[in-house]
């Protein structure tokens, strides 16, 4: 953990925490979310990956995917000569992994098929899967034993959901309430079977039949999805099956377990508190492919707060310029992005973002504001 403390923790962040999550410098007030950044599962996974290199200094090391959705952390592993499995035409290529190699499974987990392949090659496996993800796997396995179809709230191409679905029997992945409603409408009223299958083409188990496989359901989720939406989806399916089969038969048709990750929930709750403040803008820090970070940005956008999503302080500058990712769009450049005069900036970060990265972003914001009067005079 010594390396973790040196590389990822921040004295400035500790000071802000102790000052009621508030920092005031000149024209800038920074309000930090009361829950943000590295969660326990991420910290555990990164520490285990580092310790694996120390424990196997001369061995060839692999990791089946990004350890977490943070570019700086993954780059650090590459510098430690941890090899990432190549993806060729959308498929992982394990041909380079030899018998006896050491293979790290990331925080999101790995599919049953990948684990079997690595076992067959007699690899040494270091499993850093977050226990909250394992909890979801246990839930879908219970669905499978009871011959229930798993309705998984998640993104069908996200590593965690790919792994979770591999533990399920029959499954269907829904991205949001709109897709859940589409499924529930089919349960109650039927519809065009082929149209349904085409719509969910990449999001169901092999041989899925909506006329046969939507009778008994269990709900699970990708742990980083928006808590409130997962809860609404669960209630929608319960209400739909209650309407179709009645209260006496409901328990034979519907299973639900709480698989919402505590850390995800805490960060979202803290964000809902933060957006109630009088903010000039919101800065959300985390990997662009990070699901939990994107959901934090959604909360700011839904509350009408101007927000920028960046993955590191390198996106800021030179000058009063930022390269950021608006919700649902590609990278854009915003210049100027910090308004003149007194501003209050809300700051949060995803569960895969180290405190050091948050500190770097804050320091750049402060530097821009300190230089602003000079820039204005020069202009």
UniProtKB/Swiss-Prot annotation:
Gene3D superfamilies referenced in this protein's UniProt entry, alphabetically: 3.40.50.11270, 4-hydroxy-3-methylbut-2-enyl diphosphate reductase, catalytic domain
Residues at which (2E)-4-hydroxy-3-methylbut-2-enyl diphosphate binds: 69, 158, 223, 290-292, 352
Family: Belongs to the IspH family.
One example of a Gene Ontology biological process annotation: terpenoid biosynthetic process
Keyword tags: 4Fe-4S, Iron, Iron-sulfur, Isoprene biosynthesis, Metal-binding, Oxidoreductase
Pathway the protein contributes to: Isoprenoid biosynthesis; dimethylallyl diphosphate biosynthesis; dimethylallyl diphosphate from (2E)-4-hydroxy-3-methylbutenyl diphosphate: step 1/1; Isoprenoid biosynthesis; isopentenyl diphosphate biosynthesis via DXP pathway; isopentenyl diphosphate from 1-deoxy-D-xylulose 5-phosphate: step 6/6
GO molecular function: 4 iron, 4 sulfur cluster binding; 4-hydroxy-3-methylbut-2-enyl diphosphate reductase activity; metal ion binding
Keyword Iron: yes
Catalytically driven reaction(s): isopentenyl diphosphate + 2 oxidized [2Fe-2S]-[ferredoxin] + H2O = (2E)-4-hydroxy-3-methylbut-2-enyl diphosphate + 2 reduced [2Fe-2S]-[ferredoxin] + 2 H(+); dimethylallyl diphosphate + 2 oxidized [2Fe-2S]-[ferredoxin] + H2O = (2E)-4-hydroxy-3-methylbut-2-enyl diphosphate + 2 reduced [2Fe-2S]-[ferredoxin] + 2 H(+)
EC id: 1.17.7.4
Positions contributing to [4Fe-4S] cluster binding: 39, 130, 261
Record's protein name: 4-hydroxy-3-methylbut-2-enyl diphosphate reductase
Residues where isopentenyl diphosphate binds: 69, 158, 290-292, 352
Obligatory cofactor(s): [4Fe-4S] cluster
Binding site residues for dimethylallyl diphosphate: 69, 158, 290-292, 352
């Amino acid at each position: 953990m010594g390396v973790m403390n040196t590389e990822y923790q921040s004295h400035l962040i500790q000071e802000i925490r102790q000052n009621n999550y508030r920092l005031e410098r000149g024209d800038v007030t920074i309000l930090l979310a009361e829950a943000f950044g590295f969660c326990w599962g991420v910290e555990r996974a990164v520490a285990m990956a580092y310790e694996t290199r120390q424990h196997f200094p001369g061995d060839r090391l692999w990791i089946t995917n990004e350890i977490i959705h943070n570019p700086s952390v993954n780059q650090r592993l590459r510098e430690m000569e941890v090899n990432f499995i190549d993806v060729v035409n959308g498929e992982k290529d394990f041909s380079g992994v030899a018998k006896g190699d050491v293979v790290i499974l990331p925080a999101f987990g790995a599919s049953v098929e990948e684990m079997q392949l690595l076992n067959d090659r007699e690899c040494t496996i270091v499993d850093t899967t977050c226990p909250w993800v394992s909890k979801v796997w246990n839930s879908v396995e219970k669905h499978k034993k009871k011959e229930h179809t798993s309705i998984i709230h998640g993104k069908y191409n996200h590593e965690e959901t790919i792994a979770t679905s591999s533990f399920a029997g029959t499954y269907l992945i829904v991205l949001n309430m709109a897709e859940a409603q589409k499924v529930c409408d089919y349960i109650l009223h039927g519809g065009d079977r082929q149209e349904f299958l085409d719509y969910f083409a990449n999001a169901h188990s092999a041989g899925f039949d909506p006329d046969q496989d939507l009778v008994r359901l269990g709900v699970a989720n990708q742990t980083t999805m928006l808590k409130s939406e997962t809860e609404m989806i669960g209630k929608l399916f319960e209400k739909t099956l209650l309407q179709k089969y009645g209260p006496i038969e409901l328990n034979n048709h519907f299973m639900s377990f709480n698989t919402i990750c505590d850390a995800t929930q805490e960060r979202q709750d803290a964000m809902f508190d933060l957006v109630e403040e009088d903010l000039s803008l919101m800065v959300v820090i985390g990997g662009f492919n990070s699901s939990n970070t994107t959901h934090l940005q959604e909360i700011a956008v839904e509350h009408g707060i101007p927000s920028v999503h960046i993955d590191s302080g390198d996106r800021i500058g030179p000058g009063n310029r930022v390269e950021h990712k608006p919700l649902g769009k590609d990278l854009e450049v915003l210049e100027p992005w910090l308004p003149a005069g007194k501003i209050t900036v809300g700051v949060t970060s995803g569960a895969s973002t180290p405190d050091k990265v948050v500190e770097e972003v804050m320091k750049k914001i402060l530097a821009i504001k300190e230089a602003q009067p000079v820039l204005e005079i020069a202009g």
